[in-house]
Amino acid sequence: MKTFTAKPETVKRDWYVVDATGKTLGRLATELARRLRGKHKAEYTPHVDTGDYIIVLNADKVAVTGNKCTDKVYYHHTGHIGGIKQATFEEMIARRPERVIEIAVKGMLPKGPLGRAMFRKLKVYAGNEHNHAAQQPQVLDI
């Protein structure tokens, strides 16, 4: 018996919607990364994108444990000399709550073209509304 290898054109991708209200950031991100990668499927193949599309709602209501609300710091660089910028978790949630989940999930996906393709299937929204009703997403309880 030969080893099964999924073909990109035959992979069936479903759409799921997840409510992030009250969920712990890291635990939510690990499950999202696992499903984006396709590891929950029997036909998982490491070098093929077999994951599903995931819509995350209420990103502004995601929780962190301990003092991470004030202690967790996100850094980015503008590209100019002395251009390192930082923001705490509270500031990120106030400014762009979607980025908190996106950064957490992106760090858990493979680096390179395959990881970028997987990351494109993640849709994160701060509020309770999304514009993917045509895809008929199923509710996923994490």
Curated annotation (Swiss-Prot):
Any one of the GO BP annotations: translation
Entries under PROSITE patterns matching the protein: RIBOSOMAL_L13
Tagged with keyword Ribonucleoprotein: yes
Pfam families for the chain: Ribosomal_L13
Disulfide-linked positions: none
SUPFAM superfamilies: Ribosomal protein L13
GO MF, any single term: mRNA binding
Chain coiled-coil ranges: none
Recorded superkingdom: Bacteria
UniProt xrefs under InterPro entries: Ribosomal_uL13, Ribosomal_uL13_bac-type, Ribosomal_uL13_CS, Ribosomal_uL13_sf
Keywords (A to Z) from UniProt: Ribonucleoprotein, Ribosomal protein
CC annotations in GO: cytosolic large ribosomal subunit
Entry's family note: Belongs to the universal ribosomal protein uL13 family.
Reported function: This protein is one of the early assembly proteins of the 50S ribosomal subunit, although it is not seen to bind rRNA by itself. It is important during the early stages of 50S assembly.
NCBIfam families attached to this UniProt entry: rplM_bact
Subunit structure of this chain's protein: Part of the 50S ribosomal subunit.
Protein name per UniProt: Large ribosomal subunit protein uL13
Source organism of this protein record: Shigella boydii serotype 18 (strain CDC 3083-94 / BS512)
